[in-house]
C-alpha cells in the first residue's frame, strides 16, 4: 500500500510518500526559515504564499523520486488541523485536486497526532497505551496515546510553548531565528562550576500535586529582567541556565505523568526534540526512573514533514477512515477524528 502525506500547517512545505506505513520512498521539505528570519518569527501571509509557490514543484520531485504514478496511491493524507488557516488551505487544496482527478481517498489528519506516527517510520514498537510528549514551536503537552489517531490530553502549556520560548529568548539575546539551535550552541560553550547556583527560577515550583502543566512565559521574563540588572552575565551562561530550567520542568512533568497514569513507555516528538541536550537528559531521566523512552533518531523527523502525515494516514486508512472533498481545515486543535 502506497500513501502520500501533505504537510503545510506552518512554515514547512513537505510531501512524503511511503509504502505500508513505514518504508520511505521519498520525502521533500521546503523550509521557510530564511523567509521569516528578518521578522524574528512566522508571518502567516508569507507562509501561505510560500506554500503556494513551492508545493507543485515539490509534488513533482517527490513523485519522480518515488518512481510512482498517481494511480499507484492508495490514499492521500493531509494535515487539516491545527495550524495557520491560509497554510492549511494550500495543502488541503492539493489533496482535493488529486482526489478529483484520480479519485484517491482523502484523509484529513491532526498535525499533533502525526508527530507521534513518525516513530513508526523508525521501527519503534507500537504497543499501546503509551505517553506522548510533544514539544514544538506551538505545542508543549503530554498525552495518553490509545492508538494512532486517538489520544487523551494529560497536561498542556498554560502560555508559551517551549519552542516559542526558545525563539523569544534568542531574540532578547540578539541570536538568529530560529532560536533553538543557537541557544543550544551557546549553552554548550558554558561549563558551570560544581557549586554554581541557578540564575533563573525553578518553573511552576508550587504546582499542585499530581497536576501536569507547562509554562515558559515566566522564563522569558526572567531572562529579560536578568539582562536589565546584570549586564556582565554572558550569553553562554544565560543559555545554559535557560535550557536547564526549561528541561527540568519537562522532566518533572514526565515524572508526574508516569505517576498519574501508571504508563512507563514514552514517545517524545516535535521540533524541540532536535535539541541533543534535551534528548540526552531525557535518556538519563528514563534510565533512572525505569521508563522506556523513544525519540526520533533522524533530526529531519523532529520537524514538520509529510512522511509522518502519510504514516498516520496509513493507520487511519486501514480502519476505514476517509473524507470527501468538502472537508474543512481548522486552525484550532482537534485531538480525535471520528
From Swiss-Prot:
Binding site for Fe cation: 111, 115, 304
Subcellular localization: Cytoplasm
Gene Ontology MF terms in the entry: iron ion binding; N(6)-L-threonylcarbamoyladenine synthase activity
GO BP terms: tRNA threonylcarbamoyladenosine modification
Any one Pfam family match given in the protein's UniProt record, by short name: TsaD
SUPFAM superfamilies: Actin-like ATPase domain
Cofactor note: Binds 1 Fe(2+) ion per subunit.
Positions contributing to substrate binding: 134-138, 167, 180, 275
EC number, as in UniProt: 2.3.1.234
A GO CC annotation given for this chain: cytoplasm
Cofactor: Fe(2+)
Keywords: Acyltransferase, Cytoplasm, Iron, Metal-binding, Transferase, tRNA processing
Catalysed reaction, written as an equation: L-threonylcarbamoyladenylate + adenosine(37) in tRNA = N(6)-L-threonylcarbamoyladenosine(37) in tRNA + AMP + H(+)
Source organism superkingdom: Bacteria
Family: Belongs to the KAE1 / TsaD family.
Function: Required for the formation of a threonylcarbamoyl group on adenosine at position 37 (t(6)A37) in tRNAs that read codons beginning with adenine. Is involved in the transfer of the threonylcarbamoyl moiety of threonylcarbamoyl-AMP (TC-AMP) to the N6 group of A37, together with TsaE and TsaB. TsaD likely plays a direct catalytic role in this reaction.
HAMAP family: TsaD
Entry-linked PANTHER family: TRNA N6-ADENOSINE THREONYLCARBAMOYLTRANSFERASE (PTHR11735), TRNA N6-ADENOSINE THREONYLCARBAMOYLTRANSFERASE, MITOCHONDRIAL (PTHR11735:SF6)
Designated name of the protein: tRNA N6-adenosine threonylcarbamoyltransferase
Gene that produces this protein: tsaD
Amino acid at each position: 500500500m502506497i500513501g502520500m502525506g501533505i504537510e503545510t500547517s506552518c512554515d514547512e512545505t513537505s510531501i512524503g510518500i511511503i509504502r505500508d506505513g513505514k518504508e520511505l520512498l521519498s520525502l521533500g521539505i521546503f523550509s521557510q526559515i530564511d523567509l521569516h528570519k528578518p521578522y524574528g518569527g512566522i508571518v502567516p501571509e508569507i507562509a501561505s504564499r510560500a506554500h503556494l509557490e513551492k508545493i507543485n514543484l515539490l509534488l513533482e520531485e517527490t513523485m519522480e523520486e518515488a518512481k510512482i504514478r498517481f494511480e499507484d496511491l492508495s490514499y492521500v493524507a493531509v494535515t487539516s488541523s491545527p495550524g495557520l488557516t491560509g497554510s492549511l488551505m494550500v495543502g488541503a487544496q492539493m489533496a482535493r485536486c488529486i482526489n478529483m482527478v484520480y479519485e484517491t481517498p482523502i484523509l484529513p489528519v491532526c498535525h499533533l497526532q502525526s508527530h507521534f506516527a513518525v516513530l513508526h517510520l523508525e521501527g519503534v514498537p507500537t504497543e499501546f497505551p503509551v505517553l506522548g510528549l510533544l514539544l514544538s514551536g506551538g505545542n508543549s503537552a503530554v498525552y495518553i496515546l490509545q492508538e494512532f489517531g486517538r489520544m487523551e490530553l494529560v497536561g498542556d502549556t498554560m502560555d508559551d510553548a517551549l519552542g516559542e520560548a526558545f525563539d523569544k529568548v534568542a531574540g532578547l539575546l540578539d541570536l538568529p531565528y530560529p532560536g533553538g539551535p543557537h541557544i543550544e550552541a551557546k549553552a554548550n560553550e558554558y561549563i558551570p562550576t560544581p557549586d554554581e547556583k541557578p540564575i533563573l527560577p525553578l518553573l511552576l515550583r508550587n504546582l499542585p500535586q499530581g497536576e501536569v502543566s507547562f509554562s515558559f512565559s515566566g522564563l522569558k521574563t526572567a531572562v529579560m529582567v536578568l539582562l536589565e540588572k546584570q549586564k556582565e552575565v554572558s550569553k553562554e551562561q544565560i543559555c545554559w541556565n535557560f535550557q536547564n530550567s526549561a528541561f527540568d520542568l519537562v522532566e518533572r512533568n514526565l515524572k508526574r505523568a508516569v505517576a498519574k497514569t501508571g504508563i512507563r513507555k514514552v514517545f517524545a516528538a516535535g521540533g524541540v526534540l532536535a535539541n541533543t541536550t534535551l534528548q540526552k537528559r531525557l535518556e538519563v531521566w528514563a534510565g533512572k526512573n525505569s521508563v522506556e523512552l523513544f525519540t526520533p533518531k533522524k533530526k529531519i523527523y523532529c520537524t514538520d514533514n509529510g512522511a509522518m502525515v502519510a504514516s498516520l494516514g496509513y493507520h487511519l486508512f486501514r480502519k476505514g477512515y476517509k473524507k470527501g472533498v468538502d472537508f474543512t481545515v481548522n486552525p484550532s486543535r482537534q485531538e480525535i477524528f471520528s
